[in-house]
Amino acid sequence: MAPTQVLQRALKQKEYIKIIELAVKSPNNRVYLLNLQDDTFWKRISRECYGRVDFIHVFRNKLDWKIISISPLSITIANRFKSHLIWSLVSEQKFLTQDFILAFGDLLDMEEISKNYNNLSLSVQQKYAHKLNWKRIVASHILLKEWFQEPIKQYINYDYVSKYKHLNTALINNVSCMENVNLSAYMQDCVKISDALILYCLREGRVQELKLIAHSIPWSDHMLVFDEYPGLVNTLHSDWKCIDKWTAFNAPPAYYIRHMFAHPEFRNEFEENFNAQYWHKLINYTVITNVRASAAFNLMLFQNYKNRVDWTELQQCNQFLNLGVLYRAPFPRVDLQAVPRFDDEKLWKAYGRHLKLNSDECDDPQVIPLHMNVKTAYHKMILVEPCATQQEHDSVETCSAIFKLNGGEEGLLNWNLLSATQPICPFNLRHLQNVNANTYRNKNNHFMEDVYEQMVAIQMNNN
């Protein structure tokens, strides 16, 4: 039986997609192709027929199943021609879908699948846990909590998990998971040591594993741990003797070694060798710690070592109040050099007001913002609130209050700027004597005639 002319033309022009379509439409075409003995033709068309169920079924004994087995396969095709496919070759494909692997895992070489895929679904991992190469899976896949549960638990090698994976806080806090972890192997990589892991070791009696590597842990990366276990400072230094000298690498929050600041040599070491990285960590810790005494102590340090602190970073944390007051003060409220020991209550009284206790608190509008210069402050802010009476001036001196709040006159007082921009207190004799009367009259938006006349009279009498 002769094939159709259209098929003959397609064969001549090697239009394989068209041949596939024509082959199943005409009995003559079918018979002709079934009798066609041309290995090259059948190899070529085997590459093009994926997804054509009817064509594959009719010509299943003519097609090259090696080629089909390495070509894209749908679940429908695989189910229909399960016995024809060469599953070892199918297993070598690198783009099988998860559903396909789940459906045919019993036929696939799961050793090969373990090697070629780093995204096997949990369903695949659970269904074929007994066939997978878990050394490869652990090394290439994301750690799942289900690895610590049946059925995977029976087949996985937890030594590989300990070596290759990074445990998250949820897993570390799950005792049944941690029972399977080789902590000694896990903690060989210091990058994997987290606050949660250290707390687990201390809480669950796994201190021996922690002790073995304590000397290499950058304890300044784990400041919050000391909030829960303040005694760890003495453990590290005196009991385990793994730290003989506190440095920027291993120091806890400064509050927990506050006794060291009584020694001049340590203060000098702290100022000179505790680098910017440590200060950055201390700032981050101060923002999130719940130990208010420690936070207040750190603010005291920030003021004593103000040139070592990134005040912009502090400001951006949005956890502090009126930092400009601390920054501009000519002297620290608590002088580190003069205090042999620190009293939490006194520190809190001095610095606690600068810690935000709730999100609604905001900076005092009378405080000069941290990075506003003095000239701008004179032009944009009211720095002098005149006293209403002589008695008010003598008792509370309201007119000097904003200057005092911002560190005092020493760093802020500028007579020319004061003359041009600020209200003048009629009861502040020093101001009346030193303000430039002409500037006050001609440039000051707060000019008052009676204050001007009083000013001129006092200055003329002085002359």
From Swiss-Prot:
Name of the protein in its database record: Uncharacterized 54.7 kDa protein in IAP1-SOD intergenic region
Q: Which domain of life is it from?
A: Viruses
**Organism of origin:** Autographa californica nuclear polyhedrosis virus
